[in-house]
Amino acid sequence: MYFEQFYLTCLSHASYMLGSEGTAAVVDPQRDVEIYLEEAAKHGFSIDYVIETHLHADFVSGHHELAARTGAKIYLGAKAGAKFPHVPIHDGDQLTFGKCHLKFLETPGHTIESVSVVVTDLEKPSCPLAVLTGDTLFIGDVGRPDLSGDMTPQQLAGMLYDSLHRKLLKLPDEVLVFPAHGAGSLCGRQMSSERSSTIGKEKATNYALRPNSRTEFVKLLTAELPERPGYFALDVEINRSGASPLQEMPLLSALPPKEVMARRDAGAIVLDTRSASDFGAVHIPGSIQVGLAGQYASWAAIVLGLDKEIVLVAEDRQKVAEARMRLTRVGIEK
């Protein structure tokens, strides 16, 4: 059985491809999906399944485009209210292709529709190989419980406790844990930089899995929650509907200085992606600097939101292309 993690450092986001006997599934794909198409072609896989562990809030997923380009079925928690054709996941549902067997667990708490995926290699069927936990269980942390507009953080934290203690922590200690995010993500507070773990290690080291009562857990998880970025709710709705294909986005053209000034004066944001030192030396008056290093797209979304017209400033066309792609990953397209 084939298993591969794809880690997008700039968003601290992990996605996965599982394959066997010519068929593959992709779990929690990033918006630009070429990486999965190329990997599938390299191994002779047909991508037949796209699985979302939940409606992501911190990035725009590629599930809709990947399904459109491959004919794959999209699997998503039944409570997501998705507005595109999909297979609704219920607790205990199973999917098998080749030697790869998937069992779905409904694990609400981070979001109401969250699911985890237990992966078993049928050539070694005595114990599951891994569990893909989405944003329910991280390495060293658990998902924040404040992303639902219909439920309180206390209600979600209680559900998260039940999902962890009644389902995920019942798995054998040797089962590998692969989450959807690592350190730097805004979906948790104390995530490790490690990209995988085991159920046993998390039981022993994860602060949120200390042997607390349900009441103590809820109090711990809801105390001093960091502010929820404003764009999170917008990304959830984009993912609920399915993002427009990146291939349909218009090409960018270079603008003369007078046009840049005119657009700025009309309300556009001039976003300077150069380093702070280069920006400090010379920049367009009124422009905002968010450098490409680090969490560029997340910071841009926090500072600017998703609905303003953006004029990009960068050293060269390659940097412009990078800046634009990274912005589209969080839903900034204008």
Regions found by a protein language model. Give the residues of each.
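Conserved beta-strand hairpin/beta-sheet module of binuclear metal-dependent hydrolase folds
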Residues: 1-46, 117-119, 124-134, 140
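Divalent metal-coordination and catalytic microenvironments
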Residues: 18, 28, 54, 66, ...
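Active-site metal-binding loops of divalent metal-dependent hydrolases
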Residues: 29-30, 55, 79, 111, ...
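Active-site metal-binding motif and surrounding structural segment of the metallo-beta-lactamase
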Residues: 33-75
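Active-site-proximal cofactor/substrate-binding loop regions of enzyme domains
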Residues: 65, 74, 86-117, 138-139
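Cytosolic catalytic domains that perform sulfur/thiol-centered chemistry
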Residues: 157, 170-172, 186-334
